[in-house]
A protein has these predicted regions:
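Active-site nucleotide/adenylate-binding loops and adjacent lid/helix of ATP-dependent enzymes
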Residues: 2-12, 74-77, 85-179, 233-234, ...
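Conserved N-proximal alpha/beta basic substrate-recognition cap immediately N-terminal to
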Residues: 3-7, 14-108, 113
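Short secondary-structure junctions
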Residues: 35, 104-105, 123, 243-250
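A short, glycine/Asx- and small/polar-enriched loop/turn
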Residues: 48-53, 120-123, 178, 258-264
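A short beta-strand motif that forms the metal-chelation/ATP-contact edge
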Residues: 52-56, 129, 182-186, 262-273
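Glycine-rich phosphate/pyrophosphate-binding beta-alpha loops
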Residues: 61, 136, 200-203, 269-279
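Phosphate-binding site of ATP-dependent enzymes
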Residues: 147-244, 264
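ATP-dependent carboxylate activation and anion-phosphoryl transfer catalytic cores
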Residues: 190, 228-302
Length: 302
């Protein structure tokens, strides 16, 4: 550890070298905790990560195009939040199967082996997406209202597989169009705040898999504060408890979608989620306090 004020590097990507706009106050908030924090691009060869008392993964949004390189980088960091093994688990959405096996309610998810076996059944909508992805990059929504829906869904799945991606399918849950998505954020294992996020996949959308730095990733989102109910909190906490590895984690975002039978988990975001700090007064200071504790105590070894 350094002598004097702890030093923290906030890992980001080259597209946003000074971090996501939502976190522009984080460096100053860390300073209020007596911590020197600065942004650094995760794949910049000139960065000396060993100089930091703690490296915090934040807006590394381009990692999906170089996941193995990103995980090698993470495993090479001695003190990393969140830890490398957690990043590996969370960066591939096949974890939804593991959550379901542990009794966590999740969006029904199928791994596609043969793209030509896909069908969009009458009266349904199907989401086809890569298991590794950021935002809605690579995701397509196909409605049986179109006579060529099955053909289009198969073509999209085949394109994803041609890019080396594992393909997942999920039913499109119509209630998200009116109720939105509820994103629940935990800081240092404790519930911090939640937001409502509007639907991000309009009907008929087919996003390219190679657009991780394009419009799909940086598209403006409809965000507003939301108070989760007890059922939503319980589901989110059950998902958090099912995450393998050390707990508590510095930051967690659990994304829930509404159904007639209650909320279900769509994603467990442990790599580089937007935490919507601007939507929750005090949340940036809570995050900075948690970062300072870890930087000083030597927790979160990669």
């Amino acid at each position: 550890m350094t002598i004097g004020a702890p030093r923290v590097l906030l890992a980001t990507c080259a597209n946003v070298p000074d971090g996501d706009g939502d976190e522009q106050e984080l460096v100053e908030a860390c300073a209020r905790q007596g911590v020197v924090a600065q942004w650094a691009v995760w794949d910049d060869p000139d960065v000396d990560w060993s100089m930091a008392d703690l490296v915090v993964v934040r807006s590394t949004w381009d990692y999906v195009e170089a996941r193995q390189e990103f995980l090698r980088w993470a495993r090479g960091i001695d003190r990393l939040s969140n830890p490398a093994e957690v990043l590996a688990w969370s960066s591939d959405k096949v974890y939804l199967h593991r959550l379901a096996e542990q009794g966590v309610p999740v969006v029904p998810t199928t791994v596609v082996a043969d793209a030509e076996a896909l069908t969009v059944d009458d009266g349904t909508e199907l989401v086809v997406k890569p298991s590794v992805g950021a935002g809605s990059v690579g995701a397509g929504r196909f409605s049986s209202d179109r006579p060529d829906a099955t053909i289009l869904a198969r073509a999209h799945a085949a394109d994803l597989q041609a890019h080396g991606r594992t393909v997942l399918t999920q039913p499109y849950l119509e209630r998200v169009d009116t109720g939105g998505e509820t994103d629940i954020i935990f800081i240092d294992g404790v519930f911090s705040h939640a937001v409502r996020k509007g639907a991000m996949l309009p009907g008929g959308t087919v996003n390219a898999v190679d657009g991780a730095s394009g419009d799909e990733l940086f598209r403006p989102e409809l965000i507003e504060p939301r108070t989760p109910d007890t059922v939503e909190l319980r589901v989110a906490q059950s998902a958090l408890a099912a995450v393998p590895g050390p707990q508590p984690l510095l930051y967690v975002r659990i994304d829930l979608l509404p159904t007639d039978d209650g909320p279900v988990v769509n994603e467990v975001e442990l790599v580089e989620p937007s935490l919507f700090l601007r939507s929750a007064p005090g949340s940036v200071d809570r995050l900075a306090e948690a970062i300072a504790r870890r930087a000083r105590t030597g927790t979160d070894r990669g």
